[in-house]
């Protein structure tokens, strides 16, 4: 079976790593190949996503995932900005993904994945609604530092992908 080539546009490499891992976990019988662009912030994604979509189409992508953290914006505003910036999309099969606050909230939803991926001595307490946290990235950083008995520092560029590999998709 040939791999489905999917374009991923996100804020940074750790976001596209997490998205690619989640896509693979959600569809374990399919093979995927990912091609990416990173905006390093919202402004660049808005300004470049249409051009990047064309580039990804030219690189044989048949599907596109465009991701932007909600941060403190309104959902409707972010969706409209991304749709207006992307359309007309040169890749017809696309979706816009907007993590509430930031993608680290998704990671915080699975305490066992955090423990396993980072080899922590204990499992963090469950966080009932991680998307309600104002700064999930800081919470994750503090949690890892504390649970590692102050031996490990959180590095989102490496740790997010490691944790995503252990996330339970239900």
Pin down the residues of each PLM region.
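C-terminal accessory helical subdomains adjacent to catalytic cores in phosphodiester-
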Residues: 1-5, 16-36, 43-63, 68-170
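Helix N-cap/beta->alpha junction signal
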Residues: 11-12
């Amino acid at each position: 079976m040939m791999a489905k080539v999917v374009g991923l546009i996100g804020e940074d490499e750790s976001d596209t790593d997490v998205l690619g891992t989640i896509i693979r976990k959600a569809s374990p019988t399919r093979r995927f190949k990912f091609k990416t662009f990173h905006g390093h912030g919202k402004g660049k994604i808005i300004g470049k996503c249409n051009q990047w979509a064309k580039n990804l189409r030219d690189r044989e992508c048949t599907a596109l995932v465009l991701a932007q953290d909600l941060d403190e914006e309104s959902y409707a505003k972010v969706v409209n900005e991304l749709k207006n910036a992307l359309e007309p999309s040169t890749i017809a099969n696309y979706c816009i993904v907007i993590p509430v606050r930031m993608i680290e909230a998704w990671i915080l939803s699975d305490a066992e994945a955090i423990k396993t991926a980072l080899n922590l001595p204990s499992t963090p307490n469950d966080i009932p609604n991680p998307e309600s946290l104002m700064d999930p990235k800081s919470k994750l950083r503090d949690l890892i530092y504390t649970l590692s008995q102050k031996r490990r520092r959180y590095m989102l560029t490496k740790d997010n992908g490691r944790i995503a590999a252990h996330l339970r998709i239900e």
